[in-house]
Amino acid sequence: MSAYNYPNFRTENGYLTETIRQKYLTNAIADKRVPANAHRIAALVSLTASNDTSQPIQFWQLYSVLGPERIVALIENFYTRVYRDETWFSSVFSRLGDLQQHVGTQSSMWIDVMGGGQAYHGGEYRLSFHHTHNAIALMNDRGAQRWVKLMLETLNDPSIDLTDDARVRPSINTFLGHFMSKYAAEFKFNDKAAFGVGNGSVKRKINFMTMSSEAIEALSEAELIEALTARGVDVSRYGTKVALVNKALML
């Protein structure tokens, strides 16, 4: 029996959720980190984290686990560090507003992307405007490195409550890595961010019983071997793809 019964918090698409999810999955498909049909896998695009701990939590599912208070506490911890940092870094933020203003804005963005509903008004346009205008002085190697350093200190702070689900931190790492790579490409700085271990690959679940002959034949040899092995078949007895396909068709 699963130790979890998500959602812990009611979820809803935000202004950014669908757009960011679509872009992330498109990149992940290209990198073969998720199946080619990832956009159509209900459990993958759902806003609710899986109770199956063998499945990663996608970052748009984090709100269903964390809720608003944990997210706000994390962001407040981070910006407290920002405002205590060296002037060259902290002044870019302080000239735009006080600590609580930044906590509110950043928390809203995280909540919006992570499945907490329409919290970040203005969506992608607002996000782009902020980085191309308000934060442009830090959209470079030096600024990115300091931002990452402070965020890592925040995430590693034992006072931060990420729940007892070990999948949460890799999901946050994946979320941060996705945006850092996006900004590195857009503003042409080196993407050397290392937030820690991210989500593992999501493998396609293959059920031969629900597949047509054509669909089984279209599977790769590696997919056939993995799926047959999972069903207890000794694949060493089937040395070619044709033999593997024939065995799958018999099940």
Label the model's feature ranges.
Residues 2-251:
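Core of compact, soluble alpha-helical bundle domains
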